[in-house]
Curated annotation (Swiss-Prot):
Described function: Putative C to U editing enzyme whose physiological substrate is not yet known.
Name under which the protein is recorded: Putative C->U-editing enzyme APOBEC-4
Enzyme category, top tier: hydrolase
Gene3D superfamilies: Cytidine Deaminase, domain 2 (3.40.140.10)
Length: 374
């Protein structure tokens, strides 16, 4: 394999100079060392903020920056580094890393333990004629089928309809995503921002990492998630909880304006939060499977149980009709009982005839229930 670069060892890592850059470009501040490894891959926080749009939302810029990690099959880190674009020769970082007989090709050739390549880019890879980044990445993966590639980005590059190359870039992203599970494409969001800061930004530790997320950054991450899913025709199987219900209701108007205008067109100094709204909206990343979500009713609104109140009219006594009490109701038997009642004159009769009992028949009629007719 013919080497196409020169790697120079430094105290913190290495700097790489491709051989075909025979002269320095006066219009590029990174020439000729566009690839750096180890601690040389760290950048100042100001540069990271301007390039990746963190913690503010993204805004138009022309600089391309890609951090990368090379890991083994057991996920152990073998090498970390960065690649920057060249404004003089108009090369993108992905094109430098994945070109045939390029840097990653040579590194894997000398270290067969590399099984995972992870990219953290401020822009998604493109496939425009001057760069052909996705084509080089695709061919690289065809030569190394045992190597997986995970691409994380902070904004999509030239995929909107106003760009002439948008259809070409979207089609190329679909082709790259078709290599799943060897390839995954995802936006940077949630705790991944803090991990990148700790690994690739200078003078950053766990205590100094900015914890709160700005609402504009959260909205941009959500927009990137659904946009990349629509491009590669993938269904989002997880729902993120980046905003609480209360904050989400407060930011509905901002979200509507966000869809109509470019992402974060104003600089951080120009942004002024409205009164009564906290500009620092905390972000909590929650992955919830659709199977754990409550069922969603589609179509008409499900009927709620109705409460039925029955009104009862009080019955008036004047409305009752009482049947003749002398007549027993039909079907009711009359019981006749014969009893022996002592006569009032028994005392006189006893004198004459010791005792005399008179039979009297007493008819006892059962009580007649009053029949109420409505």
């Amino acid at each position: 394999m013919e080497p196409l670069y020169e790697e120079i060892l430094t105290q913190g890592g290495t700097i790489v100079k491709p051989y075909y850059w025979l002269s320095l470009s006066l219009g590029c501040t990174n020439c000729p060392y566009h690839i750096r490894t180890g601690e040389e891959a760290r950048v100042p926080y100001t540069e990271f903020h301007q390039t990746f749009g963190f913690p503010w939302s993204t805004y138009p810029q022309t600089k391309h920056l890609t951090f990368y990690e090379l890991r083994s099959s057991s996920k152990n880190l073998i090498q970390k580094g960065l690649a920057s674009n060249c404004t003089g020769s108009h090369n993108h970082p992905e094109a430098m890393l994945f070109e045939k007989n390029g840097y990653l090709d040579a590194v894997i050739f000398h270290n067969s333990n590399i099984r995972h390549i992870i990219l953290y880019s401020n822009n998604s890879p493109c496939n425009e004629a001057k760069h052909c980044c996705i084509s080089k990445m695709y061919n690289f993966l065809m030569n190394y089928p045992e190597v997986t590639l995970s691409v994380f980005f902070s904004q999509l590059y030239h995929t909107e309809k106003q760009f002439p190359t948008s259809a070409w870039n979207r089609k190329a992203l679909q082709s790259l995503a078709s290599l799943w599970p060897q390839v995954t494409l995802s936006p940077i969001c949630g705790g991944l921002w803090h991990a990148i800061l700790e690994k690739f930004v200078s003078n950053i530790s766990g205590s100094t990492v900015p914890q709160p997320f700005i609402a504009g950054r959260i909205l941009a991450d959500r927009y990137n998630t659904y946009e990349i899913n629509s491009i590669i025709a993938a269904k989002p199987y997880f729902t993120d909880g980046l905003l609480s219900r209360q904050k989400e209701n407060q930011n509905r108007e901002a979200w509507a304006a966000f869809e109509k205008h470019p992402l974060g067109s104003a600089a951080p100094a120009q942004r002024q939060p409205t009164r009564g709204q906290d500009p620092r909206t905390p972000a909590v990343l929650m992955l919830v499977s659709n199977r754990d979500l409550p069922p969603i009713h589609v179509g008409s609104t499900p009927q709620k149980p109705r409460t039925v109140v029955r009104h009862l009219n009080m019955l008036q006594l004047s409305s009752f009709k009482v049947k003749d009490v002398k007549k027993p109701p039909s079907g009711r038997p009359v019981e006749e009982v014969e009893v022996m009642k002592e006569s009032a004159r028994s005392q006189k009769a006893n004198k004459k005839n010791r005792s005399q009992w008179k039979k009297q028949t007493l008819v006892i009629k059962p009580r007649i229930c009053r029949l109420l007719e409505r």
